[in-house]
Amino acid sequence: MPPGAPDGPGHRRRTNVTASFSMELGGRTMTLETGRLAKQASGSVLVNYGDSVVLCTAVGSATPREGVDFFPLTVDYEERMYSVGRIPGNWFRREGRPTSKAILWARLTDRPIRPLFPEGFRNDVQVVCTVLSVDPDHPVEIMGMIGASAALTISDIPFEGPIGGVIVGLVDGQFVINPTAEQQERSEMHLVVAGTEHAVLMVEAGAKEVPEQTMLDAILFGHEVIKNTIIPTIKQMQAEVGKPKREVVLFNPPPELEQAVREAATVRLREAVRNPDKLAREEAVAAVGEAVQAELAEQFPESEKHIAYLLKKVLKEEVRRAIIEEGIRPDGRSLTEIRPIECAVDLLPRPHGSGLFQRGQTQVLSICTLGTLGDMQKLDDLTLEETKRFMHHYNFPPYSVGETRPLRGPGRREIGHGALAERALEPVIPPEEEFPYTIRVVSEVLESNGSSSMASVCGSTLALMAAGVPIKAPVAGVAMGLVEDPETGRYAVLTDIQGIEDALGDMDFKVAGTKKGVTALQMDMKISGTSREILEKALMQAREGRMFIMEKMLACISEPRKELSPWAPRIITMKISPEKIRDVIGKGGSTINKIIEETKVGHTKVEIDIQDDGTIYIAAVNLEAGERARQMIEALVKDPEPGMIYTGRVTRLMQFGAFVEILPGKEGLVHISELSDKRVARVEDVVNIGDEVTVKVTEIDRLGRINLSIKDAMPKQAASQPSGRPEARQPQPKPGQGKPGPAKAGAGRPGPGKPGPGRHGR
């Protein structure tokens, strides 16, 4: 295991009204304080870590919620823009719906605490983490997780914690706890580990193709800090300021009813559940449930909810027994067998890239769209990032599972699954310097029977390669499961779990990566934790499954396409002096808008992005239009030279000649003797203000003044086409120069998050 000193619990300080407890995490002090703020909550803890401050509260309702068959737990992260010294950027200038980041942070806290409430507990519990101050070097998501655990532990709500959580980074070959912002930039992984004193409960990771063994070591390294530092500190809080746990009413059917349900349903459910088809299996199980309800209705009146609960319990026991004792899964597969896989690309004609991935009865259609750098997502949250160049969005419509429900936009599950696939793919996305496009991939789940997030990873890889995105390596993903018998210690690790195995199993362990290593990992335990042995087996078994799936994908498309879709924009990159930017834009955008209008083809316009350093990106579906825009910009920024011919506009008349604007902000003088090859008595006899004339540069004197001639340009005037812009009579680019496409690295482009003076087009 790479070296690193696990931190230890610190000291406690009390006053008349507050109690605070400190510990060292990552070489910095974290303080948990209670008794001063939000005292009417069941439990309240203020977490201080560096300059970051998070208030965590937990409240439990007095009575169970009626009519539910689940534990109604809600975890919310409340981002406050004042925490980073900013005013919200929306029209109302106040916080609105939770951002995607806040939802992901809430899920990080929800997942490890949910398994630790009593079975049958139906009281509402709400955990709220309010971010009051943000220091980028001290992660508020971890503070919220620890604070929520502490608030629940010291409250009167029944909770079988505490849990703790840390971020583990890999910097210069060393594991680092809660890395600073600078360390995170250099880290090979971003691993969140949560667990109890005895076991790991939750893992969430993004990594740059890290080997499985290194990932396992990092998980266990983080758990050591949780076990030896965080848990003792929270337990000390509980011992000194914790409230006695309340007596609650648990949803618990009477023993005689349970016995009757077992006798009536066990054999029938054993037969009904063994069916490879999801819908047929669900219908058979539902039929058994209806029959048992009817048979027991007279003996146990008004017990429908208890019977339904017990039927699920018996079904769970039967599925788990068959897996552990017989090695047989509900659809008849072996423990390591992967469902049949089908892959296809180019299903859609106009989108820039599309890929279909089907594994058993899970089917995902992924679509890739390429945009300009001006299409990057503008972020308005508490993070340091300002823009986002690669996006993956996940949609899970109700028809994918044969259900109906209102379509209200992405929920927490969709946002979480989309972020997981995005994290898996991000390490292989080419940098902006190599591929100056914004990339958006959307995964449409068309059928679902488990592991749709990992199917999204596979489908997105197909779509990216079909679109011609030069990804570093293909990425595949697989979901692993676990069934463990706590009495005997026997367990089975399942490859490619389906929906029923996810619902009735003990673990959902998703692993995505390349042939080289892991790029994303997510694990959730539904029991009190897992051991190193099981984690190692799951990781190694997942690698075997991932390689099998990748082989099927590469048989469909072996590498990224060399050419982009004809409907994708081609990007021409050019560089001008920053001092010339105003010449290209013009007053109020007049010049650049004129370029866009004059290069329009049908309803399609070029898009022009100008960066602060003078880098210009011209995006055009029509190559000729993009090339014309490039030539016009080059003409605008090129300094006049003797012999060059321009079409300009007369701006002033003097007795000795006329001033002509040949470029935005650049005027030259046509002396009266140069107005015509005949004698001119008055300047007004030849030109007037506003006239368009063709002129030739005859001289640029030592003071930079430009002398022009209409007379010398007259032989060429018939061939010119006055347009108020430089004529294309200057040297043209040689064949091969200025062609669109990805520019080479080192072209002086700005980094992400540096918006230029303007983006125009579309």
From Swiss-Prot:
GO terms for molecular function: 3'-5'-RNA exonuclease activity; magnesium ion binding; polyribonucleotide nucleotidyltransferase activity; RNA binding. Mg(2+) binds at D502, D508. It comes from the Bacteria. Residues 643-711 form the S1 motif domain. CDD domains: KH-I_PNPase (cd02393), RNase_PH_PNPase_1 (cd11363), RNase_PH_PNPase_2 (cd11364), S1_PNPase (cd04472). It is found in: Cytoplasm. Residues 729-747 have a biased composition (Low complexity). The keyword Cytoplasm applies. InterPro entries: ExoRNase_PH_dom1, ExoRNase_PH_dom2, ExoRNase_PH_dom2_sf, KH_dom, KH_dom_type_1, KH_dom_type_1_sf, NA-bd_OB-fold, PNPase. Disulfide bonds: none annotated. It is an enzyme of class 2 (transferase). One of its GO terms (cellular component) is cytosol. Its EC number is 2.7.7.8. Residues 711-762 are annotated as: Disordered. It catalyses: RNA(n+1) + phosphate = RNA(n) + a ribonucleoside 5'-diphosphate. Residues 569-633 form the KH domain. GO terms for biological process: mRNA catabolic process; RNA processing. Its cofactor is Mg(2+). It holds the Pfam family RNase_PH_C. Keywords: Cytoplasm, Magnesium, Metal-binding, Nucleotidyltransferase, RNA-binding, Transferase. HAMAP family: PNPase. NCBIfam families: polynuc_phos, PRK11824.1. Involved in mRNA degradation. Catalyzes the phosphorolysis of single-stranded polyribonucleotides processively in the 3'- to 5'-direction. Belongs to the polyribonucleotide nucleotidyltransferase family. PANTHER family: POLYRIBONUCLEOTIDE NUCLEOTIDYLTRANSFERASE, POLYRIBONUCLEOTIDE NUCLEOTIDYLTRANSFERASE 1, MITOCHONDRIAL. This is Polyribonucleotide nucleotidyltransferase. It comes from Symbiobacterium thermophilum (strain DSM 24528 / JCM 14929 / IAM 14863 / T).
